[in-house]
Amino acid sequence: MGKIRRLVLDVLKPHDPSIIRLAEELSDLPGVEAVNISIYEMDQRVENAKITLEGDDVNYDEVLKVIVESGATVHSIDEVVAGRMIIEDAETLQDPLV
């Protein structure tokens, strides 16, 4: 089975723990080489975050465990890249013109 190389998640998280702490915990997981967390919306109690993880063998179940233990929930899996290498999206006719 191919290994997950990149995982992009839409997550709803409380303000605590901070994104710094969450990124540190996620980056400590085996198979994870890099973590990026961006907050794109915030209200009084929660933050909406885009979490991107890259590595040579990202384990979704372990990632989910860290996220849930932090009090957050995964809204959606927005991108998955698996296989021997990472490929970027290719532009298609369905993509809007910019």
Model-derived regions, located:
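Long, contiguous binding/interaction regions
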Residues: M1-V98
